[in-house]
């Protein structure tokens, strides 16, 4: 059994990026050749130097919704909400083929799973009020962390979120209260190719692509294949088991179109942009490595020992220690290679986590 503690590392707080790079494609990029372990220090605008005709770049086009809300209880005390998924028998996905707002139903109550902070004194029936007199009512406790709430809003729910919701920045982005949310977060905590609303955390490896860089890739005849995985609680929830193998991922909704699967299956090399794209590809691939078009749910947990079926190169950010994302990187490049690369990244003062720099593993 693998011990989770073996995937820990110490990161100085100063290395956690608190804001995005001034220009998307100017982030630093470490290039790791997993065969020989060599490292190269570049910038993301150099990414075209590492691709060639015949490559297919697989991107996750899921769009982050403004899922963080602030309200008050009847006592006047403030409470923070992070919406996780619209409630149904399965994780929330749009009920229409539309990839643009609004994708929520209008004229009916909305029921959502959510995290509440502070959550110690929450009871069934607790009401939470918002600035426009809209209200959410707690109707069920799902488990120690998650609650079920019904919203009655003055506006259609998508417009309510646009007006009052904030970008669901991760908790390690710590700013002074007045700058807790900056105007650019709505734009920068999002990829430029986001199309399908539904994520509550961003597929951050895609942050580094600019329109100019995409133009260069197209000129190089690099094929782009979009897939969708709505990033949910399962991606960022901490692993709490001592043994890695005992961890169970929560389900997340994903889809891959016939057009994208055809592009991927004809690729000479598949480059996955991010761990979420990787999980879509590996969930949709058969044992021969052929990717099939499908829509479904995945709880695929990739950790060292996993045999990759379709991904041949990976672009990813620098991840939290002991996280499922870090374990995926270790599975792809090897635990020792990744730990050595991370130690070098700390020494070379790379920026870590969501708004940080990236690593290309070839």
UniProtKB/Swiss-Prot annotation:
Name the record gives this protein: S-adenosylmethionine:tRNA ribosyltransferase-isomerase
InterPro entries assigned: QueA (IPR003699), QueA_dom1 (IPR042118), QueA_dom2 (IPR042119), QueA_sf (IPR036100)
GO BP terms, alphabetized: queuosine biosynthetic process; tRNA wobble guanine modification
Pathway(s) served: tRNA modification; tRNA-queuosine biosynthesis
Lineage of source species: Bacteria, Pseudomonadati, Thermodesulfobacteriota, Syntrophia, Syntrophales
Compartment(s) of residence: Cytoplasm
Leading EC class: transferase
EC numbers, comma separated: 2.4.99.17
Keywords (A to Z) from UniProt: Cytoplasm, Queuosine biosynthesis, S-adenosyl-L-methionine, Transferase
Domain of life: Bacteria
One Gene Ontology molecular-function label: S-adenosylmethionine:tRNA ribosyltransferase-isomerase activity
Reactions that this protein is recorded to catalyse: 7-aminomethyl-7-carbaguanosine(34) in tRNA + S-adenosyl-L-methionine = epoxyqueuosine(34) in tRNA + adenine + L-methionine + 2 H(+)
Pfam families given in the database record: Queuosine_synth
Coiled coil residues, start to end: none
Species of origin: Syntrophus aciditrophicus (strain SB)
Known function: Transfers and isomerizes the ribose moiety from AdoMet to the 7-aminomethyl group of 7-deazaguanine (preQ1-tRNA) to give epoxyqueuosine (oQ-tRNA).
The family this protein is said to belong to: Belongs to the QueA family.
Keyword Transferase: yes
Gene Ontology CC terms: cytoplasm
Record note on quaternary structure: Monomer.
Signal peptide start and end residues: none
């Amino acid at each position: 059994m693998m011990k989770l503690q073996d995937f820990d590392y110490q990161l100085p707080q100063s290395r956690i990026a608190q804001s995005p790079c001034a220009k998307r494609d100017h982030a630093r990029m470490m290039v790791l050749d997993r065969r020989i372990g060599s490292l190269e220090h570049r910038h993301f605008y150099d990414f075209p130097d590492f691709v060639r005709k015949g490559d297919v770049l697989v991107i996750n086009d899921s769009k982050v919704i403004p899922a963080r809300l602030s309200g008050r209880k009847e006592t006047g005390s403030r409470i923070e909400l992070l919406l996780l998924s619209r409630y149904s028998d399965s994780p929330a996905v749009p009920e229409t083929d539309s990839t643009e707002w609004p994708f929520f139903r209008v004229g009916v109550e909305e029921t959502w799973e959510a995290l509440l902070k502070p959550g110690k004194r929450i009871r069934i029936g607790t009401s939470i009020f918002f600035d426009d007199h809209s209200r959410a009512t707690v109707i069920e406790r799902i488990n120690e962390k998650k609650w079920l709430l019904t919203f009655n809003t003055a506006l259609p729910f998508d417009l309510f979120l646009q007006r009052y919701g904030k970008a669901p920045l991760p908790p390690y982005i710590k700013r002074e209260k007045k700058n807790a949310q900056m105007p650019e977060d709505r734009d920068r905590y999002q990829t430029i190719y986001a199309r399908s609303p539904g994520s509550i955390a961003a597929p951050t490896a895609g942050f580094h692509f600019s329109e100019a860089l995409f133009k260069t890739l197209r000129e190089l005849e690099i094929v782009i294949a979009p897939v969708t995985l709505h990033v949910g609680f399962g991606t960022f929830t901490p692993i709490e088991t001592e043994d890695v193998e005992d961890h169970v991922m929560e389900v997340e909704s994903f889809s891959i179109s016939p057009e994208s699967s055809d592009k991927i299956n004809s690729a000479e090399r598949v480059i996955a942009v991010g761990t979420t794209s990787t999980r879509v590809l590996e969930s949709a691939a058969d044992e021969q490595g052929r990717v099939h078009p499908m829509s479904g749910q995945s709880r695929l947990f990739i950790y060292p020992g996993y045999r990759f079926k379709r991904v041949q190169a990976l672009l990813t950010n620098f991840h939290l220690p002991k996280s499922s994302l870090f374990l995926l990187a270790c599975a792809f490049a090897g635990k020792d290679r990744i730990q050595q690369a991370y130690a070098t990244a700390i020494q070379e003062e790379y920026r870590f986590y969501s708004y940080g720099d990236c690593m290309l593993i070839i």
